Amino acid sequence: MKSLESRGVTFDKISKEEAEKYFLVKNNYFRTACYRKNFEKNKKGKNNGKYIDLDFSQLVEISVLDMRYRYLIVHMCLDIEHALKVSLVSYFEENNVNTYTYVSRFLEEYEYIKANIVRMRNKSYCNNIIDKYFIFNDENDLIDWSNCPGWVMVEILAFGDFLEFYFFCKQELEGKAYLTDISENKSALYLIKNLRNACAHNNCIFENLRPKQSKPPTIVRRRVIQRSKYSKDTINKKLTVRPILEFVTLILVYDELVSEIIKKHRISELKLLFLERMKKNKEIFMKNSLILSSYRFIEDIIIGTFKEE
């Protein structure tokens, strides 16, 4: 408590005793205190270097919202991963693609993915299917993959490796035309992969909402301009914030790629979190322009994208 107090954090809505219990039972110091980066500090006077209008209750609230956000995002990313895998396998079948050839060429080009398959053989739930379609020597080296069809690669690969296979096949089969489609744009999908990994590893996503150096893919920036009421300058500034850029990209790809049945349920959850739960204790953030402007920007994108959901 002394460390937070020395930095200007108050305990008006949650007492110090309650805060101590919170750290013992619900969360640790680092994962709670990290959100202080979203608050301004005094730059002069006796309180120089101390936070302005930062109560412990605000840190707790952001922590709770971040947790709920991560849970939802993991499911949305899984929906996108599923949709991409279905679309690629369907493409193979509809066009009678000899997928054995593409699997062989892919693994010859991406050596590290062969090593990942070896690791999955030893640790994952895919070991039976891996043993059926791949051959290993006595040292557990992958030596033959000629009997592996495309659908098996789609099934066993982790999301990041799958994206490499996905874009390899798209490039080989269709050329670069697909790059104009946001749901098949490599930069956009890798932003989603990064967000998925961060949520899956339980990282604090809302740790810092200040503008930084992230550069949005052109297709993302153009789509946001089409859907948002904000000026281009504001959009460009907000999209330099990594958590905002990744989430906005997720929203745009999700809308375009995921089936209507799945989308209807998930967007209902999304709106419940952003348009209701996040507003529940909004009064404690009314003096924080960074948090308010970030929320309103995201709210605008959600409403502009899912008007009919």
Predicted regions, residues:
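Acidic/aromatic/glycine-rich contiguous surface patches that form carbohydrate-binding/processing clefts
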Residues: 202
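Extended intrinsically disordered or low-complexity regions, especially N/C-terminal cytosolic tails and loops
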Residues: 1-194, 206-309
